[in-house]
Amino acid sequence: MEPRAQKYHRDRLGEAIREEIETILEGELGDPRIGLVSVSAVLMADDARSARVMVNVEGDDDEAERSLEGLNAAKNYVRHELAERLRLRRPPELFFQVDRSHKMEGRVEELLERAKKRSRKKAE
């Protein structure tokens, strides 16, 4: 079990990294492959040496793949910027991943609506 202070620090660092990556993505990356992307979460490893950056991409799966390629190409630039802006001696290794949870959320809501309609029909 890790001390609460370490977990708190790691969570705060993850949130600061998320905000900085959002800022970098909004105006500093000129890669045409990167579409409309937002950072939903940054999940830090226990040792804070790596971070999984969860991104939402507007568009279809092809658009998501192109954006992921662009983000991975810009990974070292983003790490360098994080080190400077947050004054990190060793910025975490970044791993970009498409966050599909919002799509699953919509699907679950759709299934719940169907179940409600069925139960209403049975009650009638």
Model-identified regions with their sequence ranges:
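Charge-rich, low-complexity N-terminal segments
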Residues: 1-50, 56-124
